[in-house]
Amino acid sequence: MAKLTIRPATADDIAAMAELKSTYVRSLYRGFISQDILHRSTPDFHAATLRAWLESGMYRILLAECDGVLSHYIVFGTNPEEPHNGLIYEGVSSSFTSTEDKRLLVDRCLQELREMGHTIAHLWILMDNFRVRFLFENLGFRPDGARENRNMFGQELHIARYQYKLK
């Protein structure tokens, strides 16, 4: 059986996380965003964002490795608009990551948000992406009724906020 290791990300992990993110975005948003825009999802583009998040100190990044190979990661921290609530900024996984492994990483993220003193964790999900909505609903997240239209990748997308009660 494969060995799963969950640990905080370091600067040495940025290249691998950026490569995974580039592949993930192209897969996740296929059918929602034009291919021309998706081809701009490059590792260099994502590395800059990941580096800024890691260096800011405002965000935490946990990653999971399966037998030493990066399989998924999650970015989270304090919600700047609601400091008593945590916010999961993104979760990225490879195509071979099991639902159980995703659950273990999300559980660790939620535990750290609890330890930070948060009472609720929020997560924004593309409304048309039923696969991701189904995953997080199975992990205990529920839509809280908040919805927004956000310009992402040069295109307006409809997103819904999900919440998880930490206490």
For the regions a protein language model found, what residue spans apply to each?
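Conserved active-site alpha-helix within GNAT-family acetyltransferase domains
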Residues: 103-104, 127-145
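Conserved catalytic-core motifs of GNAT/GCN5-like acyltransferases
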Residues: 122-126, 142-158
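Terminal substrate-recognition subdomain of acyl/acetyltransferases
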Residues: 2, 155-167
